[in-house]
A protein has these predicted regions:
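P-loop NTPase catalytic core of nucleic-acid-dependent motor ATPases
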Residues: 57-167, 336, 343
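Conserved catalytic/switch belt of AAA+ P-loop NTPases
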Residues: 186-209
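AAA+/SF3 P-loop NTPase mechanochemical coupling elements
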Residues: 162-167, 202-220
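Structural recognition of the conserved hydrophobic beta-strand(s) that form the central parallel beta-sheet
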Residues: 173-174, 214-222, 239
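Conserved AAA+/SF3 P-loop NTPase catalytic/coupling segment centered on the Walker-B
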Residues: 171-193, 227-233
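N-terminal nucleic-acid engagement/recognition segments and initiation subdomains in replication
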Residues: 1-83, 98, 102, 348-349, ...
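A short helix-turn-beta junction within AAA+ P-loop NTPase domains corresponding to the substrate/partner-engaging
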Residues: 229-247
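Conserved alpha/beta core segments of nucleic-acid transaction machinery
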Residues: 286-330
């Protein structure tokens, strides 16, 4: 009995980790196990008070607690061969560039950090994008090392059991959840990813408790433009394209049922496990060094923002405005001007939401222009407006008066402009 009863810090349940003389098919303590334990203590020690025995089991388990993921990671020894850079190419045919390397490395370090420091800040979702049958879900399952540490059962966030479905899992796949989400649910997903803990009560507990997150989330999509159109950026979602025809090892082939290949299937599966284990060992080496951050560098963030556009619907209005600005010779513009001249609403007045959309495009999708907050005078019919000014290179001539027209003296007097301005005119 010594050392057999332990609390599993990943599942927050009691495990029996040694054979105790009766049939068991899972380490987790069950009602049948409790009956056997009661019988054991009665026959060997004459103890018959059920509550005291169960309380003693809980205390012993807590004194002998363990974390299976941390134990697995601590036991790894890296052999020095770099695998993180090539892993997604090996199994899914992805590129081996710096972006793909940084994306997977960040995801692995986030998973390690969540195991050793539950509740640490990590809100990034690695999203694998490619056709059906590419092996995206199988990759996340393989990455979790132990199938019990993986789950793809999280289908919707308004499920009352959503937190219970996270319990005991290290890597959770959210398949197609982003692709089928609307604007409101996307914000819910972002908020969900940003949380560091949940407060809830598991069965048989009297009081709810804070449960710090020990898991990370992976996403998969068969649809290329799965990201919502968000000009401010979708920094939580890190997409990586997969090309299964370029993969060196196709995960799904290891699971074919043909008997003549079953031995080879298991050999390949074991080789894949060894590869994944060594990749985790490489990530642990980085983690132990302490020389990492759970976020991208500014340069990689800039690349991510540009890269994400390949996974968003076409932004036609931004395209119209960019085309207009390329042909426009003036040095300042305002939102009403862009509404009428760039978007072609010659006779309409813009609604507030349309002006906000133009502001969003200019502030997040356009380069070479910066906003100014003090209103300036524009040609008729725009008059006095806030807007944007062109950012000039040092070698460019100053055309800052472009787009202005002379205001008559009578109109300047009506506007109440300073008298010295009138004299200058």
């Amino acid at each position: 009995m010594k050392g057999a009863i332990r609390k599993n810090l990943l599942t927050e349940r009691i495990d029996i980790v040694k054979p105790l003389g009766w049939y068991r098919d899972s380490p987790t303590l069950t009602d049948v196990d409790v009956k056997y334990l009661l019988l054991y203590f009665e026959e060997n020690y004459g103890l018959t008070v059920e509550k005291k025995i169960i309380d003693a089991v809980a205390v012993i388990a807590n004194e002998n607690r363990y974390h299976p993921v941390c134990d697995f990671l601590n036991a790894l020894q890296w052999d020095g061969t770099e695998r993180i850079r090539f892993c997604l190419h090996r199994f899914l045919g992805s590129d081996t560039d710096d972006y793909t390397y940084e994306a997977l490395k960040l995801f692995l370090l986030g998973a390690i950090s969540r195991a050793f420091k539950p509740g640490c800040k990590f809100e990034v979702m690695l999203c694998l994008v490619g056709g059906q049958g590419a092996g995206k879900s199988s990759f996340f399952r393989l990455l979790a090392v132990n199938d019990d540490w993986f789950s793809d059962d999280l289908k919707k966030l308004d499920d009352e059991n959503v937190y219970r479905k996270m319990q005991g899992h290290w890597i959770i796949e959210m398949s197609e959840m982003i692709a089928t989400a609307n604007a409101k649910s996307i914000e819910e997903i972002k908020s969900f990813l940003s949380r560091q803990k949940e407060t809830y009560k598991i069965p048989y507990e009297t009081h709810p408790a804070d449960r710090k997150r020990q898991c990370v989330f992976g996403g998969s999509s068969n649809t290329l433009d799965f990201l919502p159109l968000d000009r401010t950026g979708n920094r939580r979602f890190v997409p990586v394209m997969v090309y299964p025809e370029r993969a060196e090892v196709h995960i799904l082939e290891d699971e074919q049922a043909s008997r003549e290949y079953i031995n080879q299937m298991w050999a390949e599966a074991q080789a894949s496990r060894e590869y994944i284990n060594q990749m985790w060992a490489e990530a642990m080496e980085i983690y132990r060094s302490g020389n990492f951050r759970l976020r991208f560098s500014p340069a990689m963030n800039a690349y991510l923002k540009a890269h994400q556009k390949d996974f968003m619907p076409e932004d036609t209005k931004a395209g119209q405005i960019l085309d207009y600005l390329e042909r426009y010779s003036g040095s300042i513009v305002c939102s009403k001007q862009l509404y009428k001249e760039a978007l072609g609403h010659d006779y309409d007045e813009p609604k507030q939401w349309e002006l906000r959309e133009i502001n969003d495009i200019m502030n997040n999708a356009v380069t070479g222009w910066r906003a100014f907050s003090n209103p300036r005078y524009f040609p008729e019919p725009y008059r006095r407006q806030k807007g944007w000014e062109r950012i000039r290179n040092d070698n460019e001539p100053d055309n800052s008066m472009d787009g202005f027209q002379e205001i008559p003296t009578e109109e300047m007097e009506q506007l109440g402009l300073p008298e010295e301005w009138l004299k200058q005119k």
